[in-house]
Amino acid sequence: MLTTFLNSLMMAMTMVTMTAPAQPQMTTVATAIDSNPNKASKDASDPRAYLNEIDGDKAMTWVEAHNLSTVDKLSKDPRYSEYQADALTILQATDRIASPSFARDGMIDNFWQDGTHVQGLWRRTTWESYRSGNPQWRTILDVDALSKAEGKTWVFEGGDCLPPTSNLCLIRLSDGGKDADVVREFDIAKGEFVKEGFVLPEGKQSVTWVDENTIYVTREWTPGEVTSSGYAYVTKVVKRGQSLDQAVEIFRGQKKDVSAERGVLRDIDGKYVMDTSYRGLDFFNTELAFYPNGHPDTRKVVLPLPTTAVFSGYYKGQAIYWLKSDWTSAKGTVFHNGAIIAFDLKAALADPARVEPLVLFMPNEHQSVAGTTQTKNRLVLSILSNVTSEVRSFDFGKGGWSSFKLALPENSTLSLTSSDDESDQLFVFSEGFLEPSTLFCADAATGQVEKITSTPARFDAGGLQAQQFWATSKDGTKVPYFLVARKDVKLDGTNPTILYAYGGFQIPMQPSYSAVLGKLWLEKGGAYALANIRGGGEFGPKWHDAGLKTNRQRVYDDFQAVAQDLIAKKVTSTPHLGIMGGSNGGLLMGVQMIQRPDLWNAVVIQVPLLDMVNFTRMSAGASWQAEYGSPDDPVEGAFLRSISPYHNVKAGVAYPEPFFETSTKDDRVGPVHARKMAALFEDMGLPFYYYENIEGGHAAAANLQEHARRYALEYIYMFQKLMDNK
């Protein structure tokens, strides 16, 4: 569907980065330095408070000085130019797969970036032309030309197109990659922005079509009218031709919510079904309300389901939910955590107390649901089994629910890319660590699967193999991980190894084909490990819940267990072991550097959280309390202080020299965590690398050239720390 294409276009590229090491030996631990990191951001007693001013002159002078120092040190390595060129060649390759998305009337859309189109092209072709292998594209929007004309670095972030024709789209453009964006109405048929069309100024906002002349807008209508997480919670109706100050309020959440908004439920044909409203009570609990009588009726119905249940679609009159906790219906039926359930929505709204779902799919202890999508007549689930994928097609009829497995590659990572709401076709990508991405088109009704194209191999994988192993964590839990290394790897403890993980927010880490990793690291003798630690979504909600709040040390223990297993197997050893992670994974890296400095010789800390005492007062941090806990709660706050990297740097400890990476335009986590941690290291006389991309948002890069530069810096760092010492 076109709306799906636009909403998912700008998936952040997987970040692969590293840092420089200090001495691996553990020395005598002294008392923690008194750095006042627990002070509020405006506290004058904090010697690093000036770094809170994102674009402040003093802060940016500090940033620019460290950027220059880091680039100067790493780019002098004679390998740097080659690595940057190799990375850019891979990222801009013209023979890579143009990721397709179904549009209306048999058309295929794609968003494309290369050396000429740095910010990108939104373009379209026919299905017949696309599958020919030499598609003839028509440009819909040239983001580079728009950026040049307006003096901006526009990052295209998708949008929302009005069904059934999908000609009118509300396009989101971000200046430099921030979460905040501007919204403009665009006419695809004419290839231009609508004159005097809908326009919303920059903000963290959401917008939904009601009809051709009406939209729902949720934004910060008056200064300060946002939740404690910094998101809007008031929705107003905006009519065509109205100014924003003429908009009429239709819905208001609560300031304590993470976010809230009024929306619209449509069927697969794009027809209006009813209004909905959403309140994010916290990151994992929501109140979803339905308005059976439509707009402007304010009578709402909240179904008696757990607030952890996730609404996953509307299919043939059935509401599809994913249960994240056990639930007992009014009849006493127990529905278990992880199940996909369905029930007649209109019947449920007429008599909410009598909701009695059917179970579509109940994962076993080794499985989890990775995603759902719909075609014209089928519901499709992506399922993980021991971190490998399968795809099943479901149908609902007089006999209830039935399903079959699509004949896609085994032991691969399968990604549901786009589905067609005018047929039963869907695009599926298949890939593995050593298997380049292959695009399939599957028919969810007949089960027919057609290979469309594959990415050429970008590195020599002939002598490599990928294996899955299991480590035993501190509490006895078995934790899986993948290891990619040479088939003839010498188990002598000297193999340079990068260990990556995320471990949070129920996000699973799966094998994927990273051409940059392969070319710059694996092909040159490096090994790579991916840890499926608790906190992620590899084995469903329970695997995630096991690492929440004060149980989060389990996540960190799991990661350490994988590292120790690699060392015990003599795959690697501390002088040759580096770790990397971004965002929540950046917090993971910070914790590992502080808790076990004796295990690592390199640590890459990307767009991280690091101050866990003050994170709720930084950027969107308040929205993550359901994951991490509240610093204001006595028990949770004490735990957060005990694991907060910023609060546990100690004098007299030989830490590995870290590589901190962030972005000035990151308005989700923000650059302050990384800035102040690096400044703390600086104040203590500890060595570190620091690089802050001026553009890029939470993805830390706004275009392919910036990604290539970042990769080159990271891998030079890794080579110097892990390979050059062999």
Swiss-Prot record:
The EC number(s) this enzyme carries: 3.4.21.-
GO molecular function terms listed in the Swiss-Prot or TrEMBL record: oligopeptidase activity; serine-type endopeptidase activity
Cellular component terms (Gene Ontology): cytosol
Residue stretches in coiled coil: none
One Pfam family this sequence matches: Peptidase_S9_N
Active site: residue positions: 583 (charge relay system), 698 (charge relay system)
Enzyme type, top EC level: hydrolase
Keywords recorded for this protein, A-Z: Hydrolase, Plasmid, Protease, Serine protease
SUPFAM superfamilies noted in UniProt: alpha/beta-Hydrolases, Peptidase/esterase 'gauge' domain
Protein family (similarity comment): Belongs to the peptidase S9B family.
Stated name of the protein: Uncharacterized peptidase y4nA
